[in-house]
A protein has these predicted regions:
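Conserved SAM-binding loop
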Residues: 198-199
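A short, conserved alpha-helix within the catalytic core of class I
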Residues: 244-257
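Conserved Class I S-adenosyl-L-methionine-dependent methyltransferase catalytic core
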Residues: 17, 62, 67-160
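Conserved class I S-adenosyl-L-methionine
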Residues: 158-168
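Conserved SAM-binding loop of SAM-dependent methyltransferases across substrates and taxa
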Residues: 169-181
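Conserved SAM-binding motif I beta-strand of class I
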Residues: 184-189
Length: 337
């Protein structure tokens, strides 16, 4: 098959790449500012009125909508913004763009430095933990929740104490508290900004007396100061951070340590995206490239599904069921006991 293109085609393609890069940032901003929700509900909005109502800089708001229009997400008719042909799909995947740009933007911006081995020492990259928590709350809701609730409904018991490793915004514990009125929750989170966000969230939603958070690293669970509360936990969850346990020898040790730290856990729900295998470069779906490349830059090993299957028994757990998630890269929720 010929790969030749005309100069005109090449220029247009490169312009589209450039504009799509700008639009990618605008998607996360439009979501966070409420524009995507308003467009999803009403089908249109007035950009000038939207800017004035939300105390936003009008020329910059116009630029944001222009970026979205350049790739068919919206259409512009003067100051009126209408949904475009790709709006629904973008609105569904908006949190993935937010994770990439608002949450991980600094990592990708510094790519030339991060790729140099001489620079890969100490804290050689930065990400915005609060922005990542903001995005991951909706990513979890839209992609992991169906599998999560399927696992919860099949527990066969009513938990009394739940712990969430890498608890982020606290949404997972809030969901569990809503489902089981008598349950208490404990979140273990390494990022102070995420804990601050989570504490505000649980207080706002009326769960401040049932859900609490402690700063700690699930990979070093023995160092977490809430160890005395772990023995009460009978349901353990961990979503979108299990890959941080790897490489293999670390994953086995971390799983063993978690098993020992939570001796009375009856079910451990572990959900994460895994590394894909064999997808042609031009057929990669949304999120996959950013997730895998981003973690490669951070030096975080991403296991495949088969590699996960190979560590549970050695790590002190038995996998009783797997819930495959095909809508987000190659993701899964493991039920462990």
């Amino acid at each position: 098959m010929s790969t030749e293109v005309s100069d005109t085609q090449a220029r247009r393609a490169v312009a589209d790449i450039f504009n799509a890069t700008v639009a990618s940032h605008a998607i996360g901003a439009a979501w966070e500012l409420g524009a995507l929700d308003e467009l999803g509900e009403n089908g249109k909005l007035d950009a000038a009125e939207f800017a004035a109502r939300n105390d936003l800089h009008e020329p910059a708001v116009t630029g944001m909508f222009t970026a979205l229009a350049s790739v068919g997400i919206v259409r512009r008719e003067g100051t009126i913004v209408l949904t475009g042909p790709y709006f629904d799909e973008v609105n569904h995947t908006r949190s993935l763009f937010h994770w990439l740009n608002q949450g991980s933007g600094e990592l990708f911006r510094r790519m030339p430095e991060v790729l140099r081995n001489e620079k890969r020492v100490g804290d050689f990259y930065q990400r915005d933990a609060a922005a990542i928590s903001y995005a991951c709350r909706e990513i979890s809701e839209r992609y992991f929740d169906p599998a999560f609730w399927s696992a919860v409904e099949g527990l066969g018991y009513e938990p009394t104490m739940a712990a969430d490793l890498g608890s982020g915004s606290g949404e997972r514990l809030i969901q569990i508290a809503r489902r089981f009125p008598g349950v208490r929750g404990l979140g273990v989170e390494i990022a102070p900004d995420a804990i601050t966000m989570a504490e505000k969230e649980v207080a706002t939603k009326g769960f401040g007396d049932r859900i609490s958070f402690v700063r700690g690293d699930a990979r070093d669970i023995d160092a977490v100061e809430a160890r005395e509360r772990f023995a009460d936990v009978d349901l353990l969850t961990c979503f979108m951070m299990g890959h941080d346990f790897w490489p293999r020898e670390n994953a086995v040790k971390t799983l063993r340590d978690i098993r020992a730290a939570f001796p009375n856990v009856r079910r451990f729900l572990l959900g994460d995206a895994t590394r894909t295998v064999g997808i042609p470069d031009r057929e990669l779906p949304v999120f996959t490239l950013g997730f895998e490349f981003g973690h490669d830059m951070m030096g975080v090993y991403l296991p495949t599904m088969d590699e996960w299957d190979g560590v549970f028994e050695e790590g002190g757990w038995r996998c009783v069921k797997k819930h495959a998630i095909d809508s987000l890269s190659r993701s899964v929720v493991f039920e462990l006991e």
